[in-house]
Amino acid sequence: MKTQFVILMITVILMQMLVQTEGGILGKLWEGFKSIVGKRGLNDRDQLDDLFDSDLSDADIKLLKEMFK
């Protein structure tokens, strides 16, 4: 009975260590993914939002339309 209890306690401790380590690893992977994609990539944005920017001139819009034909 004592042996089973010791094995159970060691298993519980190892499982807790695994869960804490996995959370750290998954957290770091998620941070890396977010830094690669960036803020705009994770937002639900239309790709044509820049066309409505007031800083774009008519020539810029014409060039963009030619590029995407």
UniProtKB/Swiss-Prot annotation:
Residues where Valine amide is found: 37
Propeptide cleavage-removed residue intervals: 41-69
Signal peptide positions (record): 1-23
Entry keywords, A to Z: Amidation, Antibiotic, Antimicrobial, Cleavage on pair of basic residues, Fungicide, Membrane, Secreted, Signal, Target cell membrane, Target membrane
Origin superkingdom: Eukaryota
GO cellular component labels: extracellular region; membrane; other organism cell membrane
Protein name: Pantinin-1
Naturally occurring in which organism (per UniProt): Pandinus imperator (Emperor scorpion)
Record lineage: Eukaryota, Metazoa, Ecdysozoa, Arthropoda, Chelicerata
